[in-house]
C-alpha cells in the first residue's frame, strides 16, 4: 500500500539533510498516517488511512 492519505492524496515530501560540515544527503519526510473509521453518504462505515492533519480537519467539519 502506498504511503498516501486516501482522502487528500498527500504523500511524502523529499528534501536534504544538512550536517554541520555542510554535507548534503537526500531524505524523506513521511506523512503521519492513522487508520480511522468514517461514514460515507449511505451511512456505511469504512476504514481508511488518513493523515493526522486530515483527521483534525474532519473533526472541525463534524464529519468524523
Curated annotation (Swiss-Prot):
Gene Ontology BP terms: translation
Keywords: Ribonucleoprotein, Ribosomal protein
Listed GO CC annotations: ribonucleoprotein complex; ribosome
Domain of life: Bacteria
Any GO MF annotation of the entry: structural constituent of ribosome
InterPro entries: Bacterial_rp_bL28, Ribosomal_bL28, Ribosomal_bL28/bL31-like_sf, Ribosomal_bL28_bact-type, Ribosomal_bL28_sf
Annotated spans, Disordered: 1-21
PANTHER family named in the record: 50S RIBOSOMAL PROTEIN L28 (PTHR39080), LARGE RIBOSOMAL SUBUNIT PROTEIN BL28A (PTHR39080:SF1)
UniProt family annotation: Belongs to the bacterial ribosomal protein bL28 family.
NCBIfam families found in the cross-reference section: L28 (TIGR00009)
Record-given protein name: Large ribosomal subunit protein bL28
Lineage, broadest ranks: Bacteria, Bacillati, Mycoplasmatota, Mycoplasmoidales, Mycoplasmoidaceae
Gene from which the chain derives: rpmB
Amino acid at each position: 500500500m502506498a504511503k498516501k492519505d486516501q482522502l487528500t492524496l498527500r504523500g511524502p515530501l523529499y528534501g536534504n539533510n544538512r550536517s554541520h560540515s555542510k554535507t548534503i544527503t537526500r531524505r524523506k519526510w513521511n506523512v503521519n498516517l492513522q487508520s480511522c473509521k468514517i461514514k460515507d453518504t449511505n451511512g456505511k462505515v469504512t476504514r481508511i488511512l488518513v493523515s493526522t492533519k486530515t483527521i483534525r480537519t474532519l473533526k472541525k467539519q463534524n464529519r468524523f
